């Protein structure tokens, strides 16, 4: 997506060879017009699959996921990184390792928000090692539902996430694929 790549080059900052800071438009200060365009691209790519729900992981995937859900006119479910005290009902949970934070968390989904008839599109802000996406996949499949695709805003293609997901048969559609990061260096595929 040309507009996204342009924003990454203009406003993004590679802090090192693994970390890309895009807080000016994606995951702190959010540009709703850009998120709307992102939703348009995901809708166009995934619209023929009979998707019934969008799943995303709190919190940086919420903006692109809600815009995709709005355009596809389907519900969106936010997977929680920890079980809040208010969640007293039955849940699905799986442990996920966060690349960004360097720690584990319990990804949580209320059972009432998924059925075995659902076709799920997973949307996330970044794909690095694939741990978050694989965690979401585990929750969906534990519930007996189908993962119909995975939409990624920014993929770090030099890390193993895409390979891990494709080896398991999942279709990944990334709007910006980064080949290389380095101090003040951002290179796209």
From Swiss-Prot:
One of its GO terms (biological process) is xanthine metabolic process. 5-phospho-alpha-D-ribose 1-diphosphate binds at residues 128-132. GO terms for molecular function: xanthine phosphoribosyltransferase activity. It catalyses: XMP + diphosphate = xanthine + 5-phospho-alpha-D-ribose 1-diphosphate. Xanthine binds at residues 20, 27, 156. SUPFAM superfamilies: PRTase-like. Converts the preformed base xanthine, a product of nucleic acid breakdown, to xanthosine 5'-monophosphate (XMP), so it can be reused for RNA or DNA synthesis. Belongs to the purine/pyrimidine phosphoribosyltransferase family. Xpt subfamily. Homodimer. This is Xanthine phosphoribosyltransferase. It comes from Clostridium acetobutylicum (strain ATCC 824 / DSM 792 / JCM 1419 / IAM 19013 / LMG 5710 / NBRC 13948 / NRRL B-527 / VKM B-1787 / 2291 / W). The gene is xpt.
């Amino acid at each position: 997506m040309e507009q996204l790549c342009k924003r990454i080059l203009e406003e993004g900052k590679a802090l090192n060879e693994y970390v890309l800071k895009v807080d000016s438009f994606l995951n702190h200060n959010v540009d709703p017009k850009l998120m709307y365009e992102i939703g348009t691209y995901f809708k166009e790519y995934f619209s023929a699959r009979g998707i019934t729900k969008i799943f995303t992981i709190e919190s940086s995937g919420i903006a692109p996921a809600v815009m995709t859900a709005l355009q596809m006119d389907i519900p969106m479910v936010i997977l929680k990184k920890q079980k809040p005290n208010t969640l007293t009902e039955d849940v699905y949970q799986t442990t996920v390792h966060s690349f960004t934070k360097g720690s584990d968390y319990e990804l949580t989904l209320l059972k009432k928000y998924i059925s075995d008839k659902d076709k799920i599109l997973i949307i996330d802000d970044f794909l690095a090692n694939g741990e978050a996406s694989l965690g979401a996949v585990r929750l969906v499949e534990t519930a007996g539902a189908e993962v119909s695709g995975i939409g990624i805003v920014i993929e770090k293609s030099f890390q193993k996430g895409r390979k891990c997901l494709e080896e398991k048969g999942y279709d990944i559609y990334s709007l910006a694929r980064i080949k290389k990061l380095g101090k003040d260096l951002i290179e796209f595929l």
